Amino acid sequence: MAMKIDGANFHERVETNLHNTFMRGAVAGAQERLHTRRLEAAEELGNWEEWRALGEEIRQHTLENLDYYLMQLSENVAKRGGHVFFAQTAEEANNYIRNVVIQKNAKKIVKSKSMVTEEINLNAVLEAAGCEVIETDLGEYILQVDDHDPPSHIVAPALHKNKEQIRDVFRQKLGYKQTEKPEELALHARKMLRHEYLTADIGITGCNFAIAESGSITLVTNEGNADLVTALPKTQITVMGMERIVPTFEEMEVLVSLLTRSAVGQKLTSYITVLTGPRDEGDVDGPEEFHLVIVDNGRSNILGTEFQPVLQCIRCAACVNVCPVYRHIGGHSYGSIYSGPIGAVLSPLLGGYDDYKELPYASSLCAACTEACPVKIPLHELLLKHRQVIVEREGKAPISEKLAMKAFGLGASSSFLYKLGSKVAPSALTPFTNDDRISKGPGPLKAWTEIREFPAPNKERFRDWFREHQKGGEK
């Protein structure tokens, strides 16, 4: 599994990113802009809650009948001259794609943005096979040029970089001579990429939605790079998660409308591309050969469980853009290509609790993510369910938490210990108290009091106050 992007543990990653003041400022600013645009776009559409309910209904229906629609998709792709491969694991998907590359004697591959190819670590496999792989999405291209810096956001992978940093990367790696103006940076990237499109042997894309009734794939972009990736190379390979499918064009229209408004606050992105198999005889562009790789990689294990709603995700990152935890720690702290609330739910399911057991706790459970989700995934409830699984089934609760709960249980079950504790606590905590607040808690309380106010216990216990008033004191 190549979802993991950093070998450091969760607490080390968080500590590093909490001190990255630029990153935190960039994330906060981006969240504000994207959230505001989303609200404006939703209001303009009208009946937003009805649209959300329809999106949820479409995704739930598709998942409940996923085997049927995948078979229909496969048959229709084959009817139109395409090749379909169902990959149960990342290794199977990578091996199939590598074999196609070897068969075609391909040396250069251009790619449009694809989270699932990041998930299976496809680029590294193809580079090991002797291929040059070029990312053509501008954000992904910037990260690739910058020594394969991992993405920090599902929609805007280079969110953690500013224009000055990008300018410096381009100057160091690409011989860039101009300023940090975004227009000049984009034009330079365009100039560098144009040659790559024209000389590529294979184009690889992701898939926003596959359409079962026609065997088509839908690509949603703002840069037009996916059109060039699919139009110019002779061979096209599309890689999709098995859940990224809709029954018909009608459902696709609904989900695209929800996606573009939720992701970037637009009615539609600049390009909505629908492709159906290889080129027909007489066509002047498009691939001569088309391969569709449908990736499971743990998704089938989620079907039929309490976590199935996470597969409704349309990768809009609306949940990321409202998350207060993501706002402070950024995407790299999650240690996964999937960050934010959706990453905190999905990463343990696909990558396992050993690597991602901390992520469900990286949430205030404020439910802002659930309210923002255009297909109504109950993200905060799924995070809570993860915590339950970690504690009850995996036995992953921290030792400090186990000891604290045992101590509380012991004290709460004994009236003598409870009374003693309530008497002793104010005096015992006096060394840590400042202005009626515990400013530096002992032991496990330290992590809490570093970032939150913790009121000191009152010196007068309620039971003493109550007893005094029962004697006929103040009424």
From Swiss-Prot:
Record bears the keyword Coiled coil: no
Domain 4Fe-4S ferredoxin-type: residue ranges: 304-334, 353-382
Residues reported to bind [4Fe-4S] cluster 2: C323, C366, C369
Keyword annotations of the record: 4Fe-4S, Electron transport, Iron, Iron-sulfur, Metal-binding, Repeat, Transport
MF GO annotations: 4 iron, 4 sulfur cluster binding; metal ion binding
Biological processes annotated in GO: lactate metabolic process
Residues annotated for [4Fe-4S] cluster 1 binding in this entry: C313, C316, C319, C373
Task performed by this protein: Is involved in L-lactate degradation and allows cells to grow with lactate as the sole carbon source. Has probably a role as an electron transporter during oxidation of L-lactate.
Protein family (similarity comment): Belongs to the LutB/YkgF family.
Record's protein name: Lactate utilization protein B
Protein's organism: Geobacillus sp. (strain WCH70)
